[in-house]
Every structure is written in structure tokens, then in C-alpha cells.
Amino acid sequence: MDELGFHRTLHRPGTLLDVGAHEGGFTLPLAALPGSRVLAFEPLPESFARLRAAAGQLAHVTLRQEALGDATGEAVLRLPVVEGVANAQWASLAKRYDGFGPQVGERRVTVPLRRLDEFGLDDLTAVKLDAEGAEYEVLRGAVETLRRCRPVLSIEIEERHRPGSTWAVPAFLDALGYDAFWEHWGAWRPMAEFDRATMQVASADPSVFAASDPYVFVFYVLPREQAPAMLDRLRRAEAGAVSPPAP
């Protein structure tokens, strides 16, 4: 099951949060789910312009040209520039790219920074989070919302983006009453079975993913009080016994 399948299977009407929306590749499928209202954050101006062109006419989609974190104000977003070409998909608040080599530099963009808790959401049912190493800060700024709404989450976490993040983020969520899982070939495994020493070997070289089999970087996080029932639904969906909601 892929990340979108996870959200389709566990979909409940309400607000769906897309953090790191980029150009809308996840925003639009979320918006197609019945009874959904999507709140999408993308701070990079050029990516936000494409996101707005793709989804800006949808009345139930709200787009914010802001970054999320654990403070309010401004932050510096860094993009790697290789051979003079900037890579928007790797834009990060947590990483620095200058010094990687003679042909690698970085472009810096100052962006607005908000905490999710400022928005006072009371119907958040799902979160997709891809913040290129800043996931911990995003979650710290969302504690009140997570406690109040108990959404499900899918989070990309990689040691190559931020060393220590594969234990720090799940530990933070564990303290909030959440359990993290990863999936491989239909098997849903607890975070305790994740081996960062063998399952993220590509952290040493971002261009080589074959070094880990599997390379695990998407983690699925469930409210502890609902985890058994949700895992059962996910497993039955993998087996074809549960159909996702029709758009």
C-alpha cells in the first residue's frame, strides 16, 4: 500500500492537512476524497504558484504560502543549487547545502513561519507531512491540535535529511499517545522493528537507494486508542476486503 492508499483507506470527512504540498501532487488526490477540506502549506514561491494553478479554483482547498514549525515569524528556506540549477523538491528549513562540493551551493529564501496550533482546527482527520528534515518542529507546533483532533499521519522521515530524526520524531509522537508503523509488501510493522542501520543505508549517498532493501522512509502514525481497529482495516484493504471511499 502506498501513502495515498493509506489515506484513502482510513479517510474520514473533515480537514486534511498537506504539509510540503509542493506543486499539488498529493493535494489534488486528497481533495477528491468525499467530504474533505484540504489545507495545504507550501512556502516556496515558485512551487506555490504551480500549486495555486493546479488547485486554486477548488472551493474546498485552502492554500497557504507559509512554512509550518514551532514558532511564528520568519524562517530561511534553503534550496540546493547544483551546476547552477536549483532543486525545489529538496527545499528545507533544516538542511544546509553549501560546502557539499565545488559545484554545489544553495539559494536562500526567507518565508513566513506559522504554528499549526494557531489555526484552531477542530476537525483535522489526516496529515501528510514531508518537510525535508523539519518534521519535528512542525509537530511541536501542532501539539494542541494533535491532542484535540487525533488525526492519522503519514510522515517522510530520513536520516539523510536530519540525523537522529527516525528516533526523535516517533519518540515525540509516542509521548502524545501515537504509534508509528511502516509497511513493506503488505506487512504492517511497528517502529520497534525498523532498523535504521540497514533500512536507510542510502542516507550516505542520496543518489543510491539500492543499498537498502527495503529503503523505508514513509512512516504511518495512528492514535494509540484507535490503532488496532485501523491496522485491521489497513490489512483487510491490502487483502482486497475493504474498498476505499469513492470520490
Where does each model-flagged region fall?
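Phosphate/nucleotide-binding beta-alpha loop and adjacent structural elements of enzyme active sites
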Residues: 1-247
